[in-house]
Amino acid sequence: MSGNKVEVDKRRTFAIISHPDAGKTTITEKVLLFGNALQKAGTVKGKKSGQHAKSDWMEMEKDRGISITTSVMQFPYNGALVNLLDTPGHEDFSEDTYRTLTAVDSCLMVIDSAKGVEQRTIKLMEVTRLRDTPIVTFMNKLDRDIRDPLELMDEVEKVLNIACAPITWPIGCGKEFKGVYHLLRDEVILYQSGQGHTIQDSTIIKGLDNPELDAAIGTYAAEVREELELVLGASNEFDLELFLAGELTPVYFGTALGNFGVDHILDGIVEWAPKPQARETEVREVQPEDEKFSGFVFKIQANMDPKHRDRVAFMRVCSGRYEQGMKMHHVRLGKDVNVSDALTFMAGDRNRAEVAYPGDIIGLHNHGTMRIGDTFTQGEKLRFTGIPNFAPEMFRRIRLKDPLKQKQLLKGLVQLSEEGAVQVFRPIDTNDLIVGAVGILQFEVVVGRLKSEYKVEAIYEAISVSTARWVYCDDERKLEEFRRKCSTNLALDGGDNLTYIAPTMVNLNLSMERYPDIKFAKTREN
């Protein structure tokens, strides 16, 4: 077996998706604890308590002024090397979150068992559907009172349109949470409270009919036997092929805060989740075992510190191997670059990367030349596909305090849109500039960066725009007619792509009915 194949086979690259407050940060913590990356997990407490989560723990790096928001954490587990990509929480939610999902091979979906499927989870699952990403599910917060577990699985199946196969099943919940039954191993793992900061030695009872179970949990033993008869009759069995096709999700129950059940998920990810997969380019499919290096940029982390203009581009390695000091070909620019200072993120600490393999994420210092979707190779003219732009969900008109700086404003907005910080739209019929974003924080960041980096002071105004769609049509004549009749709703984005700006969803739906030959797209390839 080649050295590269051994390294590829070891890797599992996944992201955690959840609604805010479902426990994603706590799970990230505990996952790192099991990966020996942390000795004692720091629970996410109120910010005043001084005990911050390790994945929220990097203050802005003082010397470079870059915040890397622990976007990537790499750690060993059971003979595998796991790359966990963090998706930002509600405060800094942006398109970055969506695009991070294009750089992983599987996802862990975390659901608050008291609340069930929530809005952000629905949105993120839509994005995983673009590539049929395999999903592992964790029903969290069993140490609180929860909804009926069968009802929770039913909701996942109906709302997210994915079959559920329980792997573990809860025994009690809240103050009466006793542990879980592992359906595939035929064993009960008992829960001990107050062990959240360390890896606990769990008590395992083999077999549901074992008298030790009755001795350990009393009347709950009979209840769980009865309940499991119903569960086994009403639920799906785990099927690896369906899981890898993104059609079925294995479901685990536990409490991240109590550090119970997290190792069960990791066991499942290492055993079943795909190793780094082949990636499509415009020319051919790139296999991870290919000898020559290739990778693509899926995220650019801009500094939030006006004193520094440096940023880091996050690259997923797709084939070959990165070695310190190697020469890479930046395909879009047609230029070769020597890369000697790429970063790796072992358990959240930034280190210089000496070597990286397919599935790994490296950070490249970017002085404004890299864009999202850029491909790097060892000379081959490839371009990876499947790194999309998403239609924004919030819009503002942006206006200058000094009208003479229109040129600088446009330049700044176009550059920031290339970097993925925001999207900009120029209506065809007016001189307005409309900024679109997925998260509210993006607007604030853009105004701050326009001021510090482009010396432009701008303010936002409300605008009646509900959504945007990129428009295409194979028939040039029909497209021209559409442009003429709908010009008041049309704009060009930062890359000069034609976009329909809809004041309401009703307006969009009417236009789609009226012009059936025009394609209105929610996403656009970078």
UniProtKB/Swiss-Prot annotation:
Residues 9-277 form the tr-type G domain. Keywords: Cytoplasm, GTP-binding, Nucleotide-binding, Protein biosynthesis. Its main location: cytoplasm. Gene3D superfamilies: P-loop containing nucleotide triphosphate hydrolases, Peptide chain release factor 3, domain III. The keyword Nucleus does not apply. Transmembrane segments: none annotated. One of its GO terms (biological process) is regulation of translational termination. GO terms for cellular component: cytosol. InterPro entries: EF-G-like_DII, EFG_III/V, G_TR_CS, P-loop_NTPase, PrfC, RF3_C, RF3_dom_3_sf, RF3_GTP-bd. GO terms for molecular function: GTP binding; GTPase activity; guanosine tetraphosphate binding; translation release factor activity, codon nonspecific; translation release factor activity, codon specific. It is found in: Cytoplasm. GTP binds at residues 18-25, 86-90, 140-143. The keyword Cytoplasm applies. Increases the formation of ribosomal termination complexes and stimulates activities of RF-1 and RF-2. It binds guanine nucleotides and has strong preference for UGA stop codons. It may interact directly with the ribosome. The stimulation of RF-1 and RF-2 is significantly reduced by GTP and GDP, but not by GMP. NCBIfam families: prfC (TIGR00503), PRK00741.1 (NF001964), small_GTP (TIGR00231). This is Peptide chain release factor 3.
